[in-house]
Design a protein with these regions (language model features):
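N-terminal signal-anchor module of multipass membrane proteins
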Residues: 1-73
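Solvent-exposed interhelical
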Residues: 91-93, 129-147, 221-244
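Long hydrophobic alpha-helical segments that form multi-pass transmembrane helix bundles
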Residues: 146-224
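Specific transmembrane alpha-helix
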Residues: 68-83, 120-132, 207-230, 278-300
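Juxtamembrane membrane-water interface segments that cap and precede transmembrane helices
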Residues: 46-60, 185-201, 264-271
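Functional transmembrane helices that form membrane-embedded active or gating regions
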Residues: 8-14, 18-20, 239-242, 296-324, ...
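Alpha-helical transmembrane segments of multi-pass integral membrane proteins
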Residues: 264-363
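Aromatic-anchored segments of alpha-helical transmembrane domains
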Residues: 25-28, 105-112, 148-158, 247-255, ...
Length: 383
């Protein structure tokens, strides 16, 4: 039986493995289809009932939740890494972690050139805030976690008022010259548009940053409360995390999906209809933490080790997903005319590859290839 420390770390890696695989489900859409298909499901890639079943599953269980789970684990790992630096006796652990995340920022800048949805740069910047907040009172952290995560809902309400019923910038906003390019929802909502525009670019930047920071802070809270340790009883995970989280999260996500359907994906509700889904992020992500922790405790190491290995190589796997998507959807096939079921087949194929190769690699090495390089540069000249 592994020690408590190893169990805690492996459980985090197990959950991270699930998260990095789950992220691909949504990220692949932006490579394979026009950007609008990610948000306006009716715009592209939905030609039959199978496609709509996939959309239903993605929106209820995956969309924003897997990124939320990934962000949560980043927050937890941030504290775990800082603790390990202090235990090892490094004199300036905060400088090391700042340097480590500066490297992450540089990688993210390069990554963003190939992938408009890069989150590494945002994570690296937000790590500065985590450095100042990670050891604050846990009730304050919980409050800030909820506030920042749900601020994106307020943001959606505000930005929706910037657009008219056709998805163009309203006359009032144009007259005030707030956004000089005068572009409305753009390619966020319309498949025939090729420009995102200043308004939606600002919305995305603030939205993603706030949600990421909120979930990172929640991850720190769960870590400090030992919910990521996989040490609680089965009934604790089921009664406190899984059941309430699933019930609340699924209902809220379902409300958003039904709202879009009822309004026939009208530009008038492009942002506000997603608010219930955003509110459902925390409940569902927390339930995933409970479910994954329970699975890690219950299933054989023979099977859990595949996900643990994938999680330990999350940095490598996340970037390799971009490379594979770029090659397949941008170089080999550039029509942007895929159906959802074709994309999900591709996703399953990549899952199998990453699970197998991660297990193979980690059975021979202590770290993934990019993790090894990142670590070497992080500790360069440090003592």
């Amino acid at each position: 039986m592994p020690s408590n420390k190893n169990t805690r770390i492996e459980n985090i890696d197990f959950i991270r493995g699930v998260a990095v695989l789950g992220i691909l489900v949504m990220n692949s859409l932006i490579f394979a289809l026009p950007v609008s298909a990610y948000f306006n499901h009716s715009s592209e890639g939905a030609t039959n009932i199978i496609d709509w079943i996939i959309i239903f599953f993605q929106e209820i269980f995956i969309s924003q939740k897997m990124m939320g789970l990934f962000s949560l684990l980043f927050g937890a790992s941030f504290v775990l890494f800082l603790e390990s630096l202090r235990i090892k006796g490094y004199k300036k652990p905060k400088l090391i972690i700042l340097w480590r995340n500066f490297i992450l920022f540089l990688v993210g800048v390069i990554h963003a050139y190939f992938w408009m949805g890069d989150i590494l740069t945002i994570y690296a910047i937000l790590s500065i805030i985590l450095l100042f907040l990670h050891n604050r009172n846990i009730l304050l952290l919980l409050f800030l976690a909820v506030f920042f995560t749900y601020f994106s809902s307020i943001l959606a309400l505000i930005f929706q008022s910037f657009f008219d019923s056709e998805g163009n910038l309203s006359k009032t906003i144009i007259e005030q010259s707030i956004f000089t390019d005068k572009i409305g929802l753009g390619k966020f909502w319309f498949s025939d548009s090729i420009i995102l525009g200043e308004a939606m670019s600002l919305y995305f930047l603030v939205d993603i940053a706030c949600r990421s920071l909120g979930m990172m802070l929640l991850g720190i809270c769960l870590y400090r409360l030992n919910f990521l340790s996989a040490e609680f009883e089965k009934k604790t995970y089921i009664n406190k995390l899984i059941i309430p989280g699933f019930i609340v999260g699924i209902i809220l996500s379902l409300i958003s999906l039904v709202w879009y359907q009822i309004e026939d994906y009208s530009p008038e509700i492009a942002l506000i209809a997603n608010i219930p889904n955003k509110i459902g992020i925390i409940p569902l992500v927390v339930s995933y933490v409970g479910l994954c922790s329970l699975l890690y405790k219950k299933i054989s190491n023979k099977y859990s080790s595949y996900f643990v290995s994938t999680g330990r190589m999350a940095f490598t796997n996340y970037l390799s997903q971009t490379i594979l998507c770029f090659i397949i959807f941008n170089l080999l096939f550039s029509s942007n005319n895929f159906s959802r079921k074709e994309i999900i087949i591709f996703v399953f194929f990549i899952w199998i590859i990453q699970l197998i190769w991660s297990k193979y690699w980690m059975s021979r090495f202590n770290q993934g290839p990019l993790e090894f390089i990142w670590r070497k540069i992080t500790y360069l000249g440090k003592n």
